Regions:
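ER/secretory pathway lumenal C-terminal domains and tails of membrane proteins involved
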Residues: 1-266
Length: 266
């Protein structure tokens, strides 16, 4: 377990707000009480983990006590004040050396929907680790992580979509503008094609994709920004493609939600 200030820093007790935990998920449930019981009796002799694929309303109010180590959050006695803490050394070892990725990189392999989603989860973990390393100034290790991600979860078997716009930024921050531009263009291809498809539907049908429209607009903004900063020769061409969709129904719906989210965040 990662100890922020050494073994002497382990607190004597954890203070968990049951009120906040109950409010977040509409009440306390038996599984929450079971988690608290395990924490009370476990005395940190055995580690306790929570899967990254769980919704945060399943964390029993322990969000600020979780540290990401790979595909799971480890429950710790430390209150970090926010969710999203990463043990970069342990996570690096898990993603780069311990985890096995099967035949995902084999060209022509069939990827069913469930397997594809799991691969996307793994890719997201690579991205979170690379982002953490970039922020700590460890660009060489960040590049290693991004290259490993590209090697074991290539886009020819798990295509880039609106979830991968940050990947372009990460390549750019790590110093590889060529790969950043390649990823950004793949993401923008997906985003614009999906919007074009949505625009072929009725407004009522488009409205059912409101959340997706928001994610795509967010993705377009980030990927377009990354592409423009790389100095790629096709950057203006992609910018023009995005501009041509600005006044279409799906883009406008996504922009409305995006602007609302930005206002709420202020």
């Amino acid at each position: 377990m990662y100890l922020p200030m050494g073994k002497d820093s382990i607190p004597d007790k954890m203070i968990i707000s049951l009120k906040k935990a109950a409010a977040k998920q509409g009440g306390l449930y038996r599984q929450d009480v079971m988690i608290y019981e395990m924490l009370a009796r476990g005395d940190w002799k055995r580690p306790m983990y929570m899967s990254v694929t769980l919704g945060s309303d399943n964390y029993a109010g322990l969000d600020n006590y979780l540290v990401l180590e790979g595909l799971a959050y480890r429950v710790t006695p430390f209150n970090y004040g926010q969710m999203g803490m990463i043990d970069s050394n342990l996570m690096y070892n898990n993603l780069m050396k311990r985890f096995k990725y099967g035949n995902v990189a084999q060209k022509g392999i069939y990827m069913d929907e469930t397997t594809g989603r799991m691969c996307e989860t793994h890719r997201r973990m690579f991205m979170m680790l690379a982002d953490n390393l970039n922020r700590k100034g460890e660009k060489a290790k960040a590049i290693e992580v991004l290259k490993k991600c590209k090697e074991v979860i290539p886009d020819y078997t798990v295509p880039y979509d609106d979830d991968d716009s940050q990947l372009a930024m990460l390549w750019m921050f790590a110093g590889d503008n060529k790969e950043a531009a390649r990823v950004a263009k793949k993401v923008l291809d997906y985003d614009t094609q999906f919007l074009i498809y949505l625009n072929s539907l009725s407004q009522e049908q488009i409205n059912t994709y409101a959340r997706k429209c928001y994610f795509i607009v967010s993705s377009i903004i980030e990927a377009n920004q990354a592409l423009s900063k790389t100095g790629d020769a096709q950057a203006k061409q992609y910018e023009a493609r995005v501009q041509s969709l600005l006044h279409t129904p799906s883009m406008q719906l996504g922009m409305e939600i995006y602007q609302q989210q930005m206002q709420n965040a202020q």
